[in-house]
Each structure stands twice: as structure tokens, then as C-alpha cells.
């Protein structure tokens, strides 16, 4: 923050308030929080409301639209096996593979055949649920490329819908309007027309977004493989 010279305000988290806040949240929204991230975001909106801000802009959708997840690398490598695979594989092996902790996200061929099983993960209802549920992953195939299909399903059915729903509820709790400018339909349709080889480039995901921000964002962020 100091390096970027940004105005900011830290959100302090008091663990003693957790149960009290959780009860307050659940009573108002009538459903549980899916992740701890939702609670932290609620705390952030609480602080924003104290400053009397009425509109919040978020970066929601950037990972889904521009290819920002680790499994997107594997999808792209499977798409490009007969093209510039070797060059991109070397970049991935050197810069990205060491960052990945899940071994299933390091096996290119296994991913192509089992990505639905990997993304669903363990069915915890069999361990902890009163009732067991069979979890299925919707997998629309709108494009001929695995990467673009994965991004489409991320956008429509998987990660983004729950993220948007959670942010809407947290924002509405404090009468704040939240907006996600990356989800402009013109941006989405334009990116969907681009060949997958250009979405991840030189080992960097979100390559197009990095290009657009190259004269705006600091180099240590643009050139960070973890961003």
C-alpha cells in the first residue's frame, strides 16, 4: 500500500464478535454463509458504510473473463497440444507449477479427462450431512476449446454466481450499491471471440488485462505470476 501510495483503511477483525455478527447476518439473510470470505467481506462493507459511501466497485468477473485460475493453464495446454504447446508448457512448468499445491492441478492429461471430478472436490455430505447429495457440475460446451468452455462455465454456473450473490447480500445489508464493471456484456462478448492462445501468454494468465493496465498498474504487479 505504501509503495502504491494508496489511501486505505485497515479493517480490524475482532474474533470475539464473530458469533454475534454471524447471528445478525443469518437472521437478516435467512441462509448461512458459504465461506469465511463472505464474513470478511461483510466486515469490509460495514466499515465502508461508516464512511457513508453508497457505491462500491469490485473486480468480480476478471478471473472468469480473462482466464485467472490455475486450472485455466491446464485447459489451454490441452487446447494447444498441436500448436505452440512446448513453449507454453516450459513457461508453466517454470513459473506456475511451483505455486500450485494441489497435485491434480499439475497433471495436464489427468485434468482434461477428470476436470469435473477435480473441481467438485470431495462430497462432504457423505461425511457430515444428515442426507447425502449427489453433486453434479453443469458443463456446457459452447466452444470448441476446453479453456473457453471452462471460462464460460466459471462465469455462468460455478464460481461467479455465488460470489455475486454473496456480495449483493453483504452490500444490501448496509444499503450500499455494488457494481462489477468487468461484467459489462460488451467486454464479455469481445473476450469470448479471442483465441485461447492469447489469453495466457509467456506464463502470465489474464494476459490481455495485464496488457491493458501496463501503463497504469505497477510493474511488480503486472509481472507477478501470482496475481
Residue ranges and their predicted role:
Residues 1-135, 169-215:
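ATP-dependent adenylate-handling active sites, centered on carboxylate activation for C-N bond formation
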Residues 34-35, 141-155:
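Structural motif
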Residues 217-227:
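PAPS-dependent sulfotransferase catalytic core
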Residues 60, 144, 150-152, 162-164, ...:
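Residue-level recognition of hydrophobic positions within alpha-helical transmembrane segments
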Residues 8-11, 134-145, 227:
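Charged, low-complexity surface segments at secondary-structure and domain boundaries
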Residues 62, 106, 138-139, 153, ...:
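Intrinsic disorder/low-complexity signal
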Residues 155-170, 191:
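Short Ser/Thr-interspersed hydrophobic loop/turn segments at strand-loop and sheet-helix junctions
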Amino acid at each position: 500500500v505504501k509503495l502504491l501510495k494508496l489511501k486505505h483503511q485497515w479493517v480490524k477483525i475482532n474474533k470475539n464478535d464473530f458469533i454475534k455478527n454471524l447471528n445478525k447476518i443469518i437472521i437478516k439473510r435467512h441462509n448461512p454463509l458459504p465461506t469465511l470470505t463472505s464474513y470478511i467481506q461483510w466486515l469490509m462493507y460495514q466499515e465502508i458504510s461508516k464512511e457513508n459511501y453508497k457505491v462500491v466497485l469490485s473486480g468480480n468477473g476478471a478471473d472468469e473473463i480473462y482466464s485467472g485460475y490455475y486450472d485455466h493453464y491446464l485447459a489451454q495446454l490441452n487446447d494447444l497440444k498441436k500448436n505452440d504447446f512446448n513453449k507454453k508448457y516450459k513457461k508453466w512448468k517454470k513459473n506456475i507449477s511451483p505455486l500450485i499445491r494441489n497435485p491434480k492441478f499439475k497433471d495436464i492429461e489427468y485434468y482434461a479427462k477428470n476436470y469435473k471430478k477435480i473441481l467438485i472436490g470431495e462430497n462432504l455430505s457423505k461425511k457430515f450431512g444428515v442426507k447425502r447429495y449427489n453433486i453434479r457440475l453443469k458443463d456446457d460446451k459452447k466452444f470448441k476449446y476446453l479453456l473457453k468452455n471452462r471460462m464460460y462455465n466459471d462465469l455462468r454456473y460455478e464460481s461467479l454466481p455465488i460470489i455475486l450473490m454473496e456480495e449483493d447480500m453483504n452490500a444490501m445489508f448496509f444499503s450500499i450499491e455494488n457494481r462489477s464493471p468487468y461484467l459489462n456484456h460488451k467486454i464479455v462478448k469481445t473476450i469470448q471471440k479471442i483465441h485461447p492462445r492469447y489469453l495466457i501468454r509467456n506464463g502470465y494468465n489474464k494476459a490481455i488485462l495485464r496488457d491493458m493496465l501496463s501503463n497504469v498498474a505497477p510493474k511488480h504487479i503486472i509481472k507477478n505470476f501470482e496475481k
